Amino acid sequence: QRYREFLIRCSRNYDHVFYVAGNHEHYGYDIARSELAIRAFVPENVHFLNNNDYIIGDYVVLGTTLWTDLKNNDPLVKWDVERYMNDFRVIRNNDRRFTPDRWWEEHFRSFQWLDKKLDEYNDKKVIVMTHHAPSIRSIHERYLHSRSFNTNYGYFSELDEYVEAHPQIKYWFHGHVHNSNDYMIGTTRVISNPHGYPDTDDQNPEFKFDLNLNLD
């Protein structure tokens, strides 16, 4: 209900709203059915992108959750993320447990789609929107030296070289981490501006409510 109310407010304030689902949308639900439930309640001018593209002006927007690659499907990483991350306790998968293997399948499917679309739009200006981050540079330094470092691979995929090889990507917007980012990978500007969990102390002190970007 809170998601629906938030999206309705956004739809009233903007002509176009682009929405990519994260991991929390699936909490308490079945990932195999969540997309249909979301599409059923989003307003008409809210573009829910789950491996979908949308052309607006001179830009093509490519949207996907892009679950991480778990360090190229590394068994030790899969063991650690399953042990420490809530996703595997509160998300269902066709009435069974959500597992690291299913997570990786979601990543593979999304990455294959993204790769195909970037080939298709190699002569266009592209905005990529994902929930998970495309680089370790988006991870706050306080997590880089933790004993559970491998759990960071549940937040990003190492796509720096891939992004540099696709200069048509002018912007890459992402969420998931609870810290702000604004940096360059080659000619691509990577930005995150998360609010953090509502009604908790886990919020981003650098969140900019009035962040505006003038696209070239």
Residue ranges and their predicted role:
Residues 1-57, 120, 142-165:
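Core catalytic region of metal-dependent phosphoesterases/phosphodiesterases
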Residues 1-2, 24-31, 53-55, 68-72, ...:
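Active-site environment of divalent metal-dependent phosphoester hydrolases
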Residues 53-63, 125, 184-189:
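Beta-strand-turn-beta hairpins that frame and shape the catalytic cleft
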Residues 15, 41-42, 62-71, 98, ...:
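Short secondary-structure transition/capping segments
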Residues 13, 41-44, 48, 74-75, ...:
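A broadly tuned preference for mixed-charge, low-complexity surface segments
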Residues 62-127, 132-150:
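Active-site-proximal loop/helix segment associated with metal-binding centers of metalloenzymes
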Residues 1, 18-23, 47-51, 127-130, ...:
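Active-site neighborhood of phospho(di)ester-bond hydrolases with catalytic His/Asp-centered motifs
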Residues 140, 146, 150-170, 177-216:
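Binuclear metal-dependent phosphoesterase catalytic core
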